[in-house]
Amino acid sequence: MFTGQRNVLLLAFSQALMLSAIVMSMALGAILGGVLAPDKSLATLPIAMMVIGTAITSLPAAILMRYFGRRAGFLIGATLGFGGSLLCAFALQQQSFALFVIGHFLLGSYQGFANYYRFAAVEATAASHASRAISWVIAGGVVAAFLGPQLGQWGRNWIDGNLFVGSYLAQAMLSLGALALLSQVKLKPIAIPRFEVPRPLREIFAQPTLQASIFGAAIGYAVMIMVMTATPLAILG
């Protein structure tokens, strides 16, 4: 037991639900994109837009949470995920590739907010337990690795005549679950230094440690996306 354990557990379960939704979209997005797209070369566009959504949202999410608090930002993110899942389900029902792409962008935005769960976990615990708190939250990915793909398979035939619409409806339920959990998180306001002078971006990006971190993260994420996107398409031929 450690200080802030309740908050950390809520964030860990929220992480598991969020990543399960993202993993499901990774597994199905390119396959269904190939079915809906007017040109098969656009099959992976939904996944690309999901990644772009995460990247574009990350900075605004940080700014929003800086002034309105972590919980408000997390609830907004989960709401975007819920809307994105419903939009994807509607897109499949209407056979609309454009709506399917937009839905995945919203799901990516959900992840952009949720990537801050681990930092909130650190803020909710004593410094001596920070590493354990981060580990618990990141461990949600282990659950997602199993739940995400199974969710897609489980819901594929929920709606007669609309293959995989049920999968995205089930995905929406994950976001609702995350909303319920996140509404119970109690975090202290983020301390904002009154006379803080921000460093120039040039100075920040000149740090070798930051450069190595960005390069490593970019390579790792690119390989992960490539494998998770291309494999389902290759299996189906």
At which residue positions do the language-model features occur?
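Helix-loop junctions at membrane interfaces in 12-TM secondary transporters
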Residues: 5-6, 90-102
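C-terminal membrane-cytosol helix-exit motif in multi-pass small-molecule transporters
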Residues: 148, 152-153, 172-191
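Short amphipathic helix-loop junctions that connect adjacent transmembrane helices
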Residues: 28-40, 229-237
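Extracytoplasmic gate region of multi-pass secondary transporters
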Residues: 210-237
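C-terminal ends and interior cores of transmembrane alpha-helices
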Residues: 79-94
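Cytoplasmic helix-loop-helix junction between adjacent transmembrane helices
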Residues: 101-140
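Juxtamembrane intracellular "pre-TM" segments in multi-pass secondary transporters
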Residues: 1-5, 185-216
